[in-house]
Amino acid sequence: MLLLLARCFLVALASSLLVCPGLACGPGRGFGKRQHPKKLTPLAYKQFIPNVAEKTLGASGRYEGKITRNSERFKELTPNYNPDIIFKDEENTGADRLMTQRCKDKLNALAISVMNQWPGVKLRVTEGWDEDGHHSEESLHYEGRAVDITTSDRDRSKYGMLARLAVEAGFDWVYYESKARIHCSVKAENSVAAKSDGCFPGSATVHLEQGGTKLVKDLSPGDRVLAADDQGRLLYSDFLTFLDRDEGAKKVFYVIETREPRERLLLTAAHLLFVAPHNDSGPTPGPSPLFASRVRPGQRVYVVAERGGDRRLLPAAVHSVTLREEAAGAYAPLTADGTILINRVLASCYAVIEEHSWAHRAFAPFRLAHALLAALAPARTDGGGGGSIPAPQSVAEARGAGPPAGIHWYSQLLYHIGTWLLDSETLHPLGMAVKSS
């Protein structure tokens, strides 16, 4: 009963916090204060994002076979009749309107961005699903997972920005392919890479208050791990639970490496870490939360440095960003302070939304309930026979039972509320693969 009441309280309070997200992003230099608006940079000619081959797991994934009108998979394609999109349809068969649902969703989001960027201009699709064999072998056009696009006015000076808007709309791979068009593609609907959640590999390490390190996968409630407060000061924070835990997961991780000092952090695309401002002098904004998929060489992340016997966080330039597929499991630890040092690099405990402060406030009810249950449950007994009444789940975890596998129910709750209240572009396209509880 106590656990049920706690859950009801959490649902109500979390909903109220998410309805007014603006309360979470005031001015200041603390961690998690993201700058707005975001400046968009056009793609250069022949540039592609992400900087990997199209048919790799880190982009749109492998080719799964050509779809014809007579194949069983033809039902996977859906027509797009969005009036804000112009379809060239040079074949006069309507083929260019056919695409997977994921491709359709991204294309519709891009159409809105185009009209906002250039009033009076619409998105134009020159090629969608192809059934005539006009493309290279294993082209994703044959699966309805790729589109070639321009603007309706065919102004080529706009195409670099059009490509950037496609990236922001959530296409899994965008290529400024030629002076005449932009090529975009998406992952397959059933792809294991379609959702990455926000996690670290089980082989990642954290620093413990009592000294030494521990693998992320071995963390248990009661551990105190190295983290940072909202001013960037190092401290030890209570590990509360895993927001996601999948021991057998095979994930694609972004590998972010620095040279001075030499550190390496692996995390999934939708996870947040903190990037230092370009200029530390003057009244500049504080560190910004950034999706791992958006980190680029030359940006600076925060690492632990030892100077004169003093340990502090210092910005270190990112030397390289690569992709690696690992089968070491995937873990998303939550601390009381919402931050954690993984492999000596500062990261957020949150993912999916690029607003650390919003996420941390949304988890305030969970932290409060966790503290109350931990304080009350150990003292509960049956009063007669001396036997203990079973403790709520969160307290049982603290007694060594360990958190359950999968995505935490509170994370799923916030994600569903977020999809109702927030614009789809606010959420990372590789956000959460919600599992049934």
UniProtKB/Swiss-Prot annotation:
Lipid addition sites, Cholesterol glycine ester: 198
CDD domains xrefs: Hint
Pfam families assigned to the protein according to its UniProt record, in alphabetical order: HH_signal, Hint
Ligand binding (Ca(2+) 1): 90-91, 96, 126-127
Motif Cardin-Weintraub location, chain numbering: 33-39
Coiled coil: none
Annotated binding of Zn(2+), by residue: 141, 148, 183
Quaternary data: Interacts with HHATL/GUP1 which negatively regulates HHAT-mediated palmitoylation of the SHH N-terminus. Interacts with BOC and CDON. Interacts with HHIP. Interacts with DISP1 via its cholesterol anchor. Interacts with SCUBE2. Interacts with glypican GPC3.
Name of the protein: Sonic hedgehog protein
Lineage: Eukaryota, Metazoa, Chordata, Craniata, Vertebrata
Name of the gene encoding the protein in the UniProt record: Shh
